[in-house]
Amino acid sequence: MNSSARTRRDLPESPYLAAVNGRKPHRVPVWFMRQAGRSLPEYRALRAQHDMLSACFDAELVCEITLQPVRRHDVDAAILFSDIVVPLLGAGIDLDIVAGVGPVIASPVRTAADVAAMKPLERQRVQPIADAVRLLVSALVEVPLIGFAGAPFTLASYLIEGGPSRHHARTKAMMLADPDSWHALMEKLTDITVGFLRVQLDAGVDAVQVFDSWAGALSLANYRSYVQPHSARVFAALADYGVPMTHFGVGTAELLGAMSAALKPAPATVVGVDWRTALADAATRVMPGTALQGNLDPVVLLAGWPVVETAARAVVDDGRRAVDAGAAGHVFNLGHGVLPETDPGVLTELVSLVHSL
């Protein structure tokens, strides 16, 4: 076992850690992807003074932004404020985050020579993230902290496309036309992802979530051939830390079993489910002993409280059916991130409702 696993916080009262470890929590745990973000006025006030990348590398700012939704909403977990491309910066990739666009890569990676020129993650470059984790572990007291990283496929898509993409056409074309370069790229990105998560785990995060945001663009056959082995290596490399690990993607109903299998070496495994798939159905698709996370449609939060309440109750009921169907536990979340236009008061009320059910 990794030495850091022996010194990790003991949080026996955490509903989140109970649910993901297959124990019965004293209340339904709830947190939200992108809970620290543009829906919060206090976040917008801070970001008015800092661009996204500088915010991600300022330990005290990362700490404050991560804590904001915990204070406001009483969620059962904090997730480290970061961006999916931060580890790419740690590996020397020239990129920027452009308002209204997202990450933009200065020199996309599209050839064998481009792949060969890529450098490994330098831990010193991401030292502020470790510093932020240490601050947060001290400040959160009884609330677990979830570490954060993008999965190799999603990082590959940003690198190959040069930024966000609707169809991931260049990515899939390279994958199919030049599998040698593809797998070489995925090996390097796997090492970067593992290194970035090790930085967070060594600093004390209590769990990790790996976001494969764009994996839903793939068929099951292509996912298994070109992606799953690399994602599986991420989780296998981190298994000795002894922390729960979550694997999440959007539009991945047909991939849930394979995404669950990639998690297999982890001591406690969680698969995130989006709103398109019923949790009880997802429970039959994942590996035995897997907990589920999700899956309220983020748009529901814009539809008024009566709609939110009805939908939230349905998700909690579906989560209980999922546990009856074999899921190890259920963590209430959205099926994707909080939308910027979401009323934070609705989120606070939603947390209170879920805790009461």
Curated annotation (Swiss-Prot):
CDD domains, sorted: URO-D (cd00717)
Pathway in which the depicted protein is active: Porphyrin-containing compound metabolism; protoporphyrin-IX biosynthesis; coproporphyrinogen-III from 5-aminolevulinate: step 4/4
Highest rank taxon of the organism: Bacteria
Coiled coil residues, start to end: none
Cellular component per GO, a single term: cytosol
InterPro entries, sorted: UROD/MetE-like_sf, Uroporphyrinogen_deCO2ase_HemE, Uroporphyrinogen_deCOase
EC number in record: 4.1.1.37
Catalytic activity entry: uroporphyrinogen III + 4 H(+) = coproporphyrinogen III + 4 CO2
Location relative to the cell: Cytoplasm
Molecular function GO labels: uroporphyrinogen decarboxylase activity
UniProt keyword terms in alphabetical order: Cytoplasm, Decarboxylase, Lyase, Porphyrin biosynthesis
Record field: transmembrane: none
Biological processes, Gene Ontology terms: protoporphyrinogen IX biosynthetic process
Residues where substrate binds: 34-38, 83, 158, 213, 336
PROSITE patterns tied to this protein: UROD_1, UROD_2
Pfam families: URO-D (PF01208)
Residue(s) at site: Transition state stabilizer: 83
Assembly mode: Homodimer.
Free-text function comment from the UniProt entry: Catalyzes the decarboxylation of four acetate groups of uroporphyrinogen-III to yield coproporphyrinogen-III.
Protein family according to the UniProt entry: Belongs to the uroporphyrinogen decarboxylase family.
UniProt name for this protein: Uroporphyrinogen decarboxylase
Species annotation: Mycolicibacterium paratuberculosis (strain ATCC BAA-968 / K-10)
